[in-house]
Amino acid sequence: MRSATKLIKNVNINRCVQSNVVRSTSRLINNNSINTVRQFTSSSSSSFTSLFNNNNVNNTNIKYQRFYSSANDVVIKVPSMGDSISEGTIVAWTKNVGDSVRVDEVVCSIETDKVTIDINAPVSGTIVELFAKEGENVTVGNDLYKIAKGEVAAAPKVEAPKAAEAPKAAAPTPAPKAAETPKAAPAPKSEAPTPAPKSTTTTTSTGPSETRVKMTRIRQRTAQRLKDSQNTAAMLTTFNELDMSALMNMRKTYKDEFEKKHGVKFGFMSAFVKASTIALKEQPIVNASVEENDIVYHNNVNINVAVSAPRGLVVPVIRNCENLSFADIEKEIGRLSGLARNDALAIEDSIGGTFTISNGGVFGSMFGTPIINPPQSAILGMHAIKDRPYVVNGQVVVRPIMYLALTYDHRIIDGREAVTFLKKIKDVLENPERILLEL
């Protein structure tokens, strides 16, 4: 009798345990926690066996855990793109969800105020999630995309299909002889219909009268900076004319030898950079900038050179011009221009300038007033070289003349300093030997 009673109690206990397990599992399923069910059932099977055998039912010992993602998933965040840049715009995703990606392969491109940056994959795997769409702004430090780590199989080699043999031409079938039937009589000619009179009504185009194109981020930033420059600086422009005869003769005489020795062509821009560097050293206020109530004098001469690029005008910087030779400057101009044309300029290539040179003459501009590139205090404008009448020793002669324009911030640069600066550039370029002698 006692054995039967004990058996009944054990059966009731086991039924209670089974009932609790079913209720717990149902609750988990209703909460869509499949991972929890797997964890619950797999890791606790041995515990339940011991629990059933020992008739020890205690629901408080059951723990639930929730898993949100795999340990193999890597979330890539928007990287730092420079001290002054906090956000950018997604211009293109080169990979979509489900695509395989290898280490260092480009996944997307982000356009900033200055340059476009390619974002590479840090690991190999599969793209499982994109956190932004093309055209959306993203902030530095925010989630950009997610990769499930894994080996990516090499692309199979595709053999070129063998050329199929041309089918043999079939033997020509002899044409059947024409049946001997009487020819039909020719139909009577009908009179040509009278042409309808042409309509005099003119049709108007029903197409759209305008086309809207969203400004690129770099164009928006350029517009904002130029407007800020106009609103902040007290801009004034002074002009002078430059006789290019001596510089053009020097270039004509030494250009082949220069290119043979240094591997780069002898251009006019390097001469203007050297002349500007000499003038900036003599007039350091032109190389300065305004920060609140302070005037900041820059000890190094870092000159931005305006370059036309596919996305618009960019101004990469040539650093430490005071330490560079003609050849060094030409090589740096060539390197930066190539990067600009290929839309491959880095952030470091465009920041830290103290003075800017813009050459509108390459587009045929005769005259213009450039706008200061903030936070700088001055900009030099070059223009087209044209043969013009010029007075030399009391005689009118024809000389290749370029008009120079210097726009400066009148808050810190006086007219005397600006005119003296521009005249120094004129004197150096009209007497190129001054560059060699640093006079």
Swiss-Prot record:
Alphabetized InterPro entries for the sequence: 2-oxoA_DH_lipoyl-BS, 2-oxoacid_dehydrogenase, 2-oxoacid_DH_actylTfrase, Biotin_lipoyl, CAT-like_dom_sf, Single_hybrid_motif, SucB
GO biological-process terms attached to the record: L-lysine catabolic process to acetyl-CoA via saccharopine; tricarboxylic acid cycle
Gene Ontology, cellular component aspect: mitochondrion; oxoglutarate dehydrogenase complex
Cofactor-binding details, from the entry: Binds 1 lipoyl cofactor covalently.
Organism of derivation: Dictyostelium discoideum (Social amoeba)
Needed cofactors: (R)-lipoate
GO molecular function term, any single one: dihydrolipoyllysine-residue succinyltransferase activity
Modified sites of kind N6-lipoyllysine: 114
Transit peptide (first-last residue): 1-47
CDD domains reported for this sequence: lipoyl_domain
Keyword Mitochondrion: yes
Active site: 410, 414
Region of interest: Disordered: 163-216
Gene name, Swiss-Prot/TrEMBL: odhB
Record's protein name: Dihydrolipoyllysine-residue succinyltransferase component of 2-oxoglutarate dehydrogenase complex, mitochondrial
Keywords on record: Acyltransferase, Lipoyl, Mitochondrion, Transferase, Transit peptide, Tricarboxylic acid cycle
Lipoyl-binding domain sequence ranges: 73-148
Compartments (UniProt record): Mitochondrion
Reactions catalysed, as given in the entry: N(6)-[(R)-dihydrolipoyl]-L-lysyl-[protein] + succinyl-CoA = N(6)-[(R)-S(8)-succinyldihydrolipoyl]-L-lysyl-[protein] + CoA
Protein function: The 2-oxoglutarate dehydrogenase complex catalyzes the overall conversion of 2-oxoglutarate to succinyl-CoA and CO(2). It contains multiple copies of three enzymatic components: 2-oxoglutarate dehydrogenase (E1), dihydrolipoamide succinyltransferase (E2) and lipoamide dehydrogenase (E3).
Biased composition (Low complexity): 163-210
Family: Belongs to the 2-oxoacid dehydrogenase family.
Listed EC numbers: 2.3.1.61
Record keyword 4Fe-4S present: no
Record PANTHER family: DIHYDROLIPOYLLYSINE-RESIDUE SUCCINYLTRANSFERASE COMPONENT OF 2-OXOGLUTARATE DEHYDROGENASE COMPLEX, MITOCHONDRIAL, DIHYDROLIPOYLLYSINE-RESIDUE SUCCINYLTRANSFERASE COMPONENT OF 2-OXOGLUTARATE DEHYDROGENASE COMPLEX, MITOCHONDRIAL-RELATED
Enzyme class at the top of the EC tree: transferase
